[in-house]
Curated annotation (Swiss-Prot):
Keyword Cytoplasm on entry: yes
Pfam families: GIY-YIG, HHH_5, UvrC_RNaseH, UvrC_RNaseH_dom
Start and end residues of each UVR domain: 218-253
Protein name (Swiss-Prot/TrEMBL): UvrABC system protein C
InterPro entries named in the record: GIY-YIG_endonuc, GIY-YIG_endonuc_sf, GIY-YIG_UvrC_Cho, Hlx-hairpin-Hlx_DNA-bd_motif, RuvA_2-like, UVR_dom, UVR_dom_sf, UvrABC_protein_C
Length: 626
């Protein structure tokens, strides 16, 4: 691919030379633009003058990719910051926003799940695939959802954490708005919803869970053992027994963790495997000598960027994006450039809760070198997988011109391999439902279809319906169950598209959204005043129509079933003593009204009780003796 902008003219070069002559020596961020005014590179510097001038003073000695970039620089702008840490953070934000062509792109696998502890008086703990800056604590990401579910099960078996979604404000609890559920009666929750557990006691439990998730099992076991001994001395044997059960569960968990170091310290291990234009970085999270997790990030558009620079980009990205405890030691595959190392030191220092120096080591022999080698092997493995997937995506694009066409039409950053489409259905404002169908590689994936019975509003309100459906898919329990799509498609026009986009923004999700309006088959995207009109023969339009029609079919089918069920229930609820719940029980047990009508009194009694059973029997057998 070549730059569409022409090379800078003499006037531009003269203006650029003047800017180079007046550059400050402060730390900050610089932006290079081409003749069209497009930002093509963003960088940070400890000394802006020295760093920016180095691009122009060393022409002829630069790597190929850098030399090409410099030939297209027509303008530059700098932002002075008060520290290298500020420059590092600003650079990261600008690269995300501007997506400059010559910057290395770092992409985490956003479909990986995290464990979240919510920022509430009585926090909830669950799996999510979305990291939001909402004050909640996030742990992960976990490469396997099954691994995370095991941890959630462990936490649930040891700690009585609430599973409800109630908003337990002081006012709500004091007013007696909520009642304890089954979890309270089977000792899996202590009933904070009814004020049976104090906020202080609950938060103390959350601190223990955080200690566990940070890999500090030894410290937690010591604290719990001391507490157990204390309760036993106070003759509080029931509480001591509960603590003993917690301790035994923790010991079983600790035994399953892989010991990778004889030193019981905290360290993060980093390595990068590089290919021709792609790379992969892996970090091992080691706590108390045990490997508690790993994470990998893909780096693309790397060109011939030196390995130390790639490693620095990966490490900086990790600590900027991951809300995690800073360890005592960082083990690196290679020495970082001095300027990058100093910026990283300052960043880690600013994020530490304890005042201590983080050690940087580049081991060559022994146990630590073995850890680096193991980390690098994993990076090579993930890079190989990435290259295979990249090749496969290319083959999919060749075999499915519709996906490639759709990518071009909607200006998507990647091939829309996974598309989710929403459609609403109702009858005169009743039985409002929404459907979501999923296409993967241009074909339906019915196991990922979902349907929603909408309840958050009354009457006919298509915008409220779309808001509820999109919120429940991307903000509810499904957010952790299904991977995020490459494109969200709405069966509707500009208004519904904007509603869906607003919901995603509120949830902190940057997902492409488009809508297909029925009448003229126009394509709407958020914040665009005019729709796109594609030829009727367009492969992209045909794919969108197929998605829209399938979502409509799925919604209509579900809506008809609900209406049918309601009609059937109405016949049963017309019988004296049969309410909505009894009708649902009867239908669930017998399968149909006809089967209910043929049942004996004894059979009906097993489901609805003797008195109601006699009433039902008389209704269907009028004139017959029971």
């Amino acid at each position: 691919m070549s730059d569409t902008a022409a090379a800078p003219d003499k006037t531009a070069k003269s203006a650029l030379a003047e800017k180079l002559a007046t550059l400050p020596t402060s730390p900050g961020v610089y932006r290079f633009s081409n003749a069209a005014g497009t930002v093509i590179y963003v960088g940070k510097a400890r000394n802006l003058r020295n760093r920016v001038r180095s691009y122009f003073n060393s022409q002829g000695r630069q790597p190929g990719k850098t030399a090409v970039m410099v030939s297209h620089i027509a303008d530059l702008n700098v932002i002075i910051t008060s520290s290298e840490v500020e420059a590092l953070i600003l650079e990261n934000n600008l690269i995300k926003e501007l997506k400059p062509r010559y910057n290395v792109n770092l992409k985490d696998d956003k479909s990986y799940p995290w464990l979240v502890i919510t920022n509430e008086r009585f926090p909830r703990i669950f799996l999510t695939r979305q990291v939001r800056r909402d004050g909640s604590l996030y742990f992960g990401p976990y490469t396997e959802a099954s691994q995370l579910r095991l941890i959630l099960d462990l936490i649930g078996s040891i700690f009585p954490v609430r599973s409800c979604k109630y908003k337990l404000t002081e006012e709500a609890v004091a007013s007696g708005r909520y009642r304890v559920c089954l979890d309270y009666h089977i000792h899996k929750c202590k009933g904070p919803c009814e004020g049976l557990q104090s906020e202080e006691e609950y938060q103390a439990m959350i601190r223990e869970i955080v200690t566990l998730l940070k890999g500090k099992t030894s410290a937690l076991l010591r604290d719990l053992s001391a507490e157990m001994q204390k309760k036993a001395k106070e003759l509080k044997f029931e509480e001591a027994a509960a603590l003993k059960a917690q301790i035994e569960g923790l010991k079983r968990y600790a035994e399953r963790q892989k010991i990778v170091s004889t030193e019981a310290i905290d360290r993060d291990v980093f390595a990068v495997a590089a290919g021709e234009d792609d790379a992969c970085g892996v970090v091992f999270r080691i706590r108390e000598g045990k490997l508690i997790g790993s994470r990998h990030t893909y780096l693309s558009n790397t060109g011939n960027t030196p390995l130390p620079n790639l490693l620095a980009s990966f490490v900086e990205h990790y600590y900027l994006e991951t809300p995690d405890l800073i360890p005592q030691e960082l083990m690196l595959q290679a020495e970082l450039p001095e300027e990058e190392l100093e910026a990283l030191r300052q960043l880690l220092s600013s994020r530490q809760t304890e005042r201590r120096q983080v050690r940087f080591t580049v081991p060559r022999i022994g146990e630590k070198a073995h850890l680096i080698a193991m980390c690098l092997d994993n990076a090579k493995h993930h890079l190989h997988e990435f290259m295979v997937q990249k090749k496969l995506r290319g083959e999919i694009a060749r075999k499915s011109p519709a996906l490639e066409s759709l990518k071009q039409v909607l200006h998507l950053g990647k091939l829309p391999e996974r598309i989710e489409c929403f459609d609403n259905s109702h009858f005169q404002g009743t039985d409002y439902v929404s459907s979501m169908v999923t296409f993967v590689s241009g074909k339906p994936k019915k196991s990922d279809y979902r349907k929603f019975r909408l309840k958050s509003f009354e009457g006919s309100d298509d915008y409220a319906a779309m808001r509820e459906a999109v919120t429940r898919r991307y903000g509810g329990s499904l957010a952790g169950e299904l991977p995020l799509p490459d494109l969200v498609l709405i069966d509707g026009g500009k208004g519904q598209v904007n509603v869906a986009w607003q919901v995603l923004q509120e949830l902190g999700l940057d997902l492409p959204v488009a809508g297909l309006a029925k009448r003229l088959e126009e394509i709407y995207v958020p914040n665009e005043p005019d729709p796109y009109n594609l030829p009727k023969t367009s492969p992209a339009l045909k794919l969108l129509q197929q998605l829209r029609d399938e979502a409509h079919r799925f919604a209509i089918t579900y809506h008809r079933k609900l209406r049918s069920d309601r009609t059937i229930r109405t016949e049963l609820t017309g019988i004296k003593g049969v309410g909505e719940k009894s009708a649902e029980k009867l239908l669930k047990h017998f399968g149909s009204v006809e089967s209910v009508s043929k049942a004996s009194i004894d059979e009906l009694s097993a489901v609805a009780g003797r008195k109601t059973a006699e009433s039902i029997y008389r209704y269907f057998n009028a004139g017959d003796a029971p």
